[in-house]
Amino acid sequence: MAPKLITVLCLGFCLNQKICPHAGAQDKFSLSAWPSPVVPLGGRVTLSCHSHLRFVIWTIFQTTGTRSHELHTGLSNNITISPVTPEHAGTYRCVGIYKHASKWSAESNSLKIIVTGLFTKPSISAHPSSLVHAGARVSLRCHSELAFDEFILYKEGHIQHSQQLDQGMEAGIHYVEAVFSMGPVTPAHAGAYRCCGCFSHSRYEWSAPSDPLDIVITGKYKKPSLSTQVDPMMRLGEKLTLFCSSEISFDQYHLFRHGVAHGQWLSGGQRHREAFQANFSVGRATPVPGGTYRCYGSFNDSPYKPPVTRCNFTPQETLRVLLCHSQNPPLNLTHLALKDSPATCICSLDSQ
């Protein structure tokens, strides 16, 4: 008998005897959520059942405690929930049934749907800085005035729950916070982090997410250099421009002030004396722009485009800009550049 004919006869026998695989690992489903299982209140999410076997009836159900609620049964293997409410938070599974069989498949994996935005958002900060050299350590701190029982830190689908909470008083206001330690960091740690809070009686109902915190991993490439105007004498009110130069032709250049993005990034750099240079204008020379600046370079295959940070930056030496303010007599700013060390700005009295 031909092999194809044997296969057809065996399949027919299987269906007629209703002994096709059921409740077995080989026909177990998987359940997924698009675009994410973490959904903002009032948002939209699509749940989809997947299986390599051809089922004709699909059921998606929600489990709350020991009770199951059927959400969808039909020919379609997916359902869209919109708008999402707190009642949609919980655990979901799905099953399927053959057209000529009487038993359901095994249940799919459990999928937790989290609804965010039910409480005021916490804050998030990095210590000592969100700019972290490869191999170093950093702590992310989630902080809230609401007495949450737990904080959740997440980045692009990776979720981490707090193990311990600290409490305290600040300016007469009670707060709770959790500290998440990371390190030694690698390029995989780079990205935009957020945190949420929740209460123990409703762990699938989270607060609004914090503002994103971009963790940048530095030190992959040779560092550029940072300098200011060639003229060493600068008066208050004059235009201040910083020059970021490198031997490497980076696709983007970024300026940071006191470890925080200065709100500027430039695409590429112009060829200048055997190097590539990007020019940053930081406004007029007043006491406000003064401070410590750094510039970084990156490539398009690891772009820095706030709020998402995925790149490896190379740091340069620090440029410290010190601006002095006086109307009479006027003060001049002298800039002394030191290679591979913080540059020094010296304010001197004009002896006119």
From Swiss-Prot:
Cellular component terms (Gene Ontology): extracellular region; plasma membrane
Record carries keyword Lyase: no
Tissues in which the UniProt entry reports expression: Expressed in NK-cells.
Pfam families referenced in this protein's UniProt entry, alphabetically: ig
Glycan attachment points: 78
Keyword check for Metal-binding: no
Principal place of residence: secreted
InterPro entries xref list: Ig-like_dom, Ig-like_dom_sf, Ig-like_fold, Ig-like_Receptors_ImmuneReg, Ig_sub, Immunoglobulin_dom
Annotated S-S bridges: 49-94, 244-295
Subcellular location: Secreted
SUPFAM superfamilies linked to this entry: Immunoglobulin
Signal peptide: 1-16
Domain named Ig-like C2-type: residues: 17-112, 224-311
Keywords from the named record: Disulfide bond, Glycoprotein, Immunoglobulin domain, Repeat, Secreted, Signal
Biological process according to GO: cell surface receptor signaling pathway; immune response-regulating signaling pathway
Name this polypeptide is given: Putative killer cell immunoglobulin-like receptor-like protein KIR3DX1
Record organism: Homo sapiens
Gene: KIR3DX1
